[in-house]
Amino acid sequence: MWDIFRERGNLVTVFNPREAELTPGTNHIVCEADQLRELSAVVVEIQDVGVRYFNYTKDVMQLMEMLALLGDEAPSLYIVDHLNPSGRVVEGTIPAVAGEMFVPKVAHRHGLTLGELVNLYASETGAKFPIHVISAMATDANRQLMPWTIAPASDIPGLFSSYLYSGGGLWNNTTLTPGIGTARPYEYIGAPFVKPLRPEELPQAHGALLRPCSFTPAAGRYAGERCFGFQIMLVPGEPYHSLLHTLHLMRWFREHYSAFEFEPAFWTKLADPVLEAYLKEEIGFDVVQEHMKLEEQKWIRKAKRYILYDDAPCRMKWFAIPKKCTIFAVQNC
């Protein structure tokens, strides 16, 4: 796309990730309002991963806030849409308390494309500047290439990463690492203070197997230190509720390891008092289960107002056997 604009002579500037494309770290695409003022159009092409706390998605929402402040001087916004690599399945709840900045009021795993998210955010913020969404079906590349052919970010190297990110992204704000700095981010979970585990110790979930393992991150938290924990191995073709399973696992670690802690930013990212109460051992899983079911249904009703394609977001049905701490799921699309 850059080459096309450059050949036509209408490319003014390119806003890239702050660091190298796949460098481990917290990448963002940033710009200043003054850089936007003289432009006639801003074209956004990123691959969203379907979870509300993905950095580049938040950067697009921040861009929209800046365009809104420019008023009549704001350039038009063009979104080159892509399919959601984690599909239309939703997980989680709409933020019930003040959450992270530039995060739309959507479920943790929202089931929308970036174009649909922009459509929603524009409606909720009352955006007046022109917005154009170029359909994900408009080009051969979008129709023929898988949405994860090019890695969206350094910590999202492939398809499995996006399926795990709704829950896995929350580990970043705890004293466990989700395998950042390894070849399998969000599949490996552990820390130096965790003792070697047995599979039967951990809460299990439908759609995934847990394999005890050790790993040494090359970057990020615990870089160069040997960590013990487990690997989440997804079962092909089976639905897996990453967020619910992650909450189960976090509560287990809180009960068994005093060194396991939540950072202040964790609660802002979670943005749900009911889920917070569960992690603090104030309520049981049955309450969380019913709460999440109702919230997912509520989000789907809202999301349907903003979809741009034929298929709509849907939820997976799941139930638990508390004695075994097992979560079963059946996709309901």
Predicted feature residues:
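A short helix->loop->beta-strand "cap" motif at the edges of active sites that frequently abuts
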Residues: N10, L67-S76
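Glycine-rich, highly charged phosphate/nucleotide-binding loops
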Residues: E21-Q35
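Glycine/threonine-rich flexible loop motifs
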Residues: D48-V60
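Glycine-rich, charge-decorated loop segments at or immediately adjacent to ligand/cofactor-binding or catalytic sites
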Residues: Y78-A98
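Conserved anion/nucleotide-ligand pocket segment
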Residues: A98-G168
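Glycine-rich, aromatic-lined ligand/substrate-binding cores of catalytic
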Residues: T139-A141, L145-P217
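Conserved functional hotspot residues or short segments at active or partner-binding sites
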Residues: G190-K293
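Short, positively charged and aromatic/hydrophobic N-terminal segments
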Residues: T326-I327
